[in-house]
Amino acid sequence: MSSPERDEGTPVPDSRGHCDADTVSGTPDRRPLLGEEKAVTGEGRAGIVGSPAPRDVEGLVPQIRVAAARQGESPPSVRGPAAAVFVTPKYVEKAQETRGAESQARDVKTEPGTVAAAAEKSEVATPGSEEVMEVEQKPAGEEMEMLEASGGVREAPEEAGPWHLGIDLRRNPLEAIQLELDTVNAQADRAFQHLEQKFGRMRRHYLERRNYIIQNIPGFWMTAFRNHPQLSAMIRGRDAEMLRYVTSLEVKELRHPKTGCKFKFFFRRNPYFRNKLIVKEYEVRSSGRVVSLSTPIIWRRGHEPQSFIRRNQDLICSFFTWFSDHSLPESDRIAEIIKEDLWPNPLQYYLCREGIRRPRRRPIREPVEIPRPFGFQSG
């Protein structure tokens, strides 16, 4: 082609993008394709060994124009088969394919080699991507191993022995039943507390009226104590005389019945001690141990009672010793008898004067083992 032909209608990119064989072999930025090796150099593979990676066809146009401008010449035209190859749209497609292969093989670094080696890059791209995928999969495996080592991922044993299976089958129903039983017990406790508060208010009214009447009966509590088949053994010497000054007895449970109870003995003025109120309290601590506390008795001079009375080589506890000595083995038993037997109905023991018993609609209560509501253990 001549320069007038370019001016008449030949597209600029098609004419200016062509170069002759010398330009192709000497340009560092241009790598001939496999189909144009012989057409460009005529020397086979030896003439194009060491050519660097190709660039865009469009990128060659400004370089050729700049080189021609420096030399003062017009851009050279390419003739022959090479020109046909360059002009055809197939070259553009091949250039685009080469550019796509280069972008895929960009991460895989290789030294410049032969055209065959450069062509193999596009073929190696697929295995290279597989290698990259394999490398990316390794951290996932390491994470799984770390999770398994830390106990995050555990596989259930495929075959569990019948022994472990039997234990689980026996344990789970028992746990479920126990949970249901605990729920029922909690509901019962709440209902009991509600009823206790409701009927406690009703009982309080009658107890106040009963105490008011008993205060006007001289020696009521002394008679009730002496007529009780179990408490009468403790009334010794001056105990009966001191009990004559008891005006009122109150037994109160603490906030919750299982936490203990309190005994209050009210006295009128007497020649034996100065106290008008003596309190004996049993309290259940958080550890489960039951301890007893009492008010110290302020004895008048010369009226300190004997702590123990020896009879038949046995130690017998005095009633007033029960207030001060908390280590006596019978101390807890006395508290139970007063709370569970004497206090609910003292009238039945008051009416038993000197063994004379009134006819009753029910049999007389015999001395029996009274269950301990909260397990007294003095400390």
From Swiss-Prot:
Q: Where is this region: Disordered?
A: 1-58, 97-134
Question: Where in the cell?
Answer: Nucleus, Nucleolus
The record's Gene Ontology biological-process terms are: nucleosome assembly
InterPro entries, alphabetized: NAP-like_sf, NAP_family
Coiled-coil regions listed in the entry: none
Gene3D superfamilies (UniProt xref): 1.20.5.1500, Nucleosome assembly protein
Where does the protein principally reside?
Answer: nucleus
Could you tell me where the Basic and acidic residues compositional bias lies? 1-21, 28-40, 97-110
Record GO terms (molecular function): enzyme binding
Q: Does the keyword Phosphoprotein apply?
A: no
Q: What protein does this entry describe?
A: Testis-specific Y-encoded-like protein 1
